[in-house]
Design a protein with these regions (language model features):
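C-terminal segment of classical bacterial N-terminal signal peptides
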Residues: 14-22
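Enrichment for repetitive, rod-forming helical segments
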Residues: 10-11, 232
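N-terminal secretory-pathway/extracellular module detecting exported/lumenal segments
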Residues: 23-292
Length: 292
């Protein structure tokens, strides 16, 4: 009898310590696919790890975790192996079939972290693992945007995925278009999915395109900004720049991180007016998940 109890205890312990993703009952929800990748997440795995109580008594999640799955074509596997710098471990992309990842999300700062990643071959054997990846902010150029939106929507139901997948004219807000003396046309748009209001500062990502007189794109700026809507000032917090002669490079802020005044004769002033109007008309959206 004691032997049976001991064996039962071993079995229970084994089941208890099985990784979450090893469970046969895992139901993966499809998010998106292209020629390289297919992305899934498991709604039942979404867990609120931390939350705070605001001054008005609301409980707001500030840390959420969930499991995701990515499957790879040959091209996707090759790209992933190169990006992770593991060619010495996986020289043949055919040996990478899919990966499972535990993601940690902070909705207030729109950030995501890979807590754990396990990479598998077609025989469901782990070929490489990685833990505690860097924390990164999610924007329109992020590979993980679908994951972020699905996980946050599972908790808050604010329509992150719908806005992410909306037509361009619904997701992107045109701020201004300007033609300079050389005949270059510059257009600036704001990604409404990234907008969040912190006090009087609107945090957002903007996409600026410059085309020459022939209509050829010669420069693209992708910028994270903080715009003080009350004072009429702004600062570039992060960004990248692309030119027709160089690939993407880090965008350096000419003001060394200081806020600059937006003057009434600047093209950006028209953008400031549009941002103020957008915030006024979409207060629930820009204040979603806010702790203020």
């Amino acid at each position: 009898m004691q032997k049976k109890i001991f064996l039962l205890a071993i079995i229970c312990a084994t089941v208890f310590f099985l990784p979450h993703y090893a469970c046969a009952e895992t139901q993966w929800f499809w998010l998106d696919s292209n020629d390289k990748y297919s992305k899934y997440f498991e709604p039942d795995s979404v867990t609120i790890k931390k939350k705070v109580v605001t001054s008005d008594g609301k409980e707001i999640a500030i840390e959420i975790e969930a499991w995701t799955k990515t499957t790879y074509s040959y091209e996707g596997a090759s790209e992933t192996i190169k990006n992770y710098g593991i060619t010495n471990i996986l020289p043949d992309p055919k040996n990478l079939a899919y990966s499972l990842a535990l993601l940690r999300v902070n909705p207030q700062n729109r950030t995501l972290q890979y807590v754990r990643e396990d990479f598998y071959n077609a025989a469901h054997q782990v070929v490489w693992s990685k833990e505690e990846g860097r924390v990164k902010e999610i924007n329109s150029r992020s590979f993980d945007e679908e994951f972020y939106c699905a996980i946050v929507d599972e908790v808050f139901r604010m329509g992150e995925r719908d806005r992410k997948r909306a037509p361009r004219e619904e997701r992107w807000l045109d701020l201004w278009t300007y033609t300079d003396d050389a005949g270059n046309t510059i257009n600036l748009t704001a990604d409404t999915t990234t907008m969040r209001l912190k006090g009087t500062n609107l945090i957002l990502w903007e996409w600026q395109t410059k085309k020459d007189s022939r209509g050829q794109t010669v420069e693209i700026r992708f910028m994270k900004k903080s715009v003080n809507l009350t004072q009429g000032t702004e600062v570039i917090k992060d960004g990248q720049i692309w030119t027709s002669t160089n690939s993407w490079q880090e965008l350096k802020d000419d003001y060394d991180g200081a806020y600059r005044m937006i003057h009434s004769d600047d093209p950006d002033y028209k953008g400031l007016v549009r941002l103020r109007a957008y915030v006024k008309n979409n207060s629930n959206w820009v204040s979603r998940y806010s702790l203020d």
